């Protein structure tokens, strides 16, 4: 099968690391793969994505060549293009309309490009926003099937979701919450399918219940960009509670983002600079290597539901931590309970520093409980989130 994957920026930039295992699985399974990023900008951050570069069609979002090809395609198929434009003009507000119009020329260019090379058998977009807009336009012009993976923020945006669901073969949602939202927005049931994201799990087993030296601080990692939805502010308050009660703990914050400075100020004001480190942006391969090497005793994700409804999907960072045998503490928000249930992690209410502190104290002091939790977590990820299981199921949906 010849598959075109449309991404936001992968293999470029630091985001969309979760797409890499699925694209590589399709390639290793013998399928012909091309990747088309909307914006082919930035450095190649993730080592695993280097292998995808030779299969990437790198073009800007807009250029004279793309505009020229779009005009030629419009002249060639004026009725089809007009129908697509009418559909695009159903966008529910001006912002979304402008976003869709911005990608329209590249979608027409892509159709023309494939017609001059090899037309794919299927187009699959990651995100049901503008990536799916390109997929819908290109697939319509080429008269081939297409599908999309929907996540969380892109669903909340509601960029022509009803129209896209009606037009595509299927919508793959990464969790039940997202699937229910799209069913409500589209009125469709049969096309909406839940298939979790898959992570690449090494064959070797982690050393569950690693023994740490009591005199050393309990080492905790929080992986996540500094955004309101991640709930950093509540975790810092929880760390202060633990330190005030004599706990020996050190927190590593991995990531960047607009709220980093305010979190740094919070750490300084609470006199926690000796107990909290800012690691910056870690590459995906570096993060995985350190997880499997036992660099951290626990991974925590204190995510919240923001005032505008932003929330977590099923965080890949938690899947990978659980696969590596690292105990997890998280909040019961978004899609997290789908992953972290039935004794696989400690879940606490959102925006509750005291509950976070109590959960972290449990992980620090109850080794036997942590080992049981880590074993159950690894089984959960192996059975339900392994790319070796998810990869073939996604490809089967496309055929």
What role is predicted for each listed range?
Residues 1-64, 115-118, 144:
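N-terminal subdomain of nucleotide-sugar transferases
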Residues 17, 218, 222-241, 247, ...:
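A conserved mid-protein helix/loop that constitutes part of the nucleotide-sugar donor-binding site
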Residues 177, 198:
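Carbohydrate-associated surface elements
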Residues 261-286, 293, 297:
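Nucleotide-activated donor-binding/catalytic signature segment of Leloir-type glycosyltransferases, i.e.
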Residues 275, 355, 362, 369-384, ...:
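A short, well-ordered alpha-helix in the C-terminal region of glycosyltransferases
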Residues 292-310, 326:
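Acidic donor-binding loop of glycosyltransferase active sites
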Residues 301, 318, 323, 327-330:
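Short hydrophobic beta-strand element within catalytic cores of glycosyltransferases
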Residues 339-353, 362-368:
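Conserved acidic donor-binding segment of nucleotide-sugar-dependent glycosyltransferases
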